[in-house]
Swiss-Prot record:
GO cellular component labels: cytosolic small ribosomal subunit
Name of the molecule in the record: Small ribosomal subunit protein eS28
Gene Ontology MF terms: structural constituent of ribosome
Keywords: Ribonucleoprotein, Ribosomal protein
UniProt organism field: Pyrobaculum islandicum (strain DSM 4184 / JCM 9189 / GEO3)
A Gene Ontology biological process term: translation
Family classification: Belongs to the eukaryotic ribosomal protein eS28 family.
Length: 77
């Protein structure tokens, strides 16, 4: 068993830079779909599409808990 004590929920999070805003999604448009570039960790330099809830703009740094999942593209019905 691990005897590690975690003091912060962001201890194992990875920093990512918002490089492009793709659009808004969600029932009321409360989620923004963005492209982010991973700044550290094993996926450093990788570009992902992610959904972010809350205010976001170009150049922001967001903390991602994991870098495996990628958001689906916004499509018109």
């Amino acid at each position: 068993m691990s005897s590690e004590v975690k003091f912060s929920p962001y201890e194992d999070a990875v920093a990512a830079l918002v490089i492009q805003i793709l659009g808004r999604t969600g029932v009321a448009g409360e989620v923004t779909q963005v492209k982010v570039k991973i700044l550290e960790g094993r996926d450093k330099g990788r570009i992902l599409t992610r959904n972010i809830k809350g205010p976001v703009r170009l150049g922001d740094i967001v903390m991602l808990r994991e870098t495996e999942r990628e958001a689906r593209r916004i499509t018109a019905r």
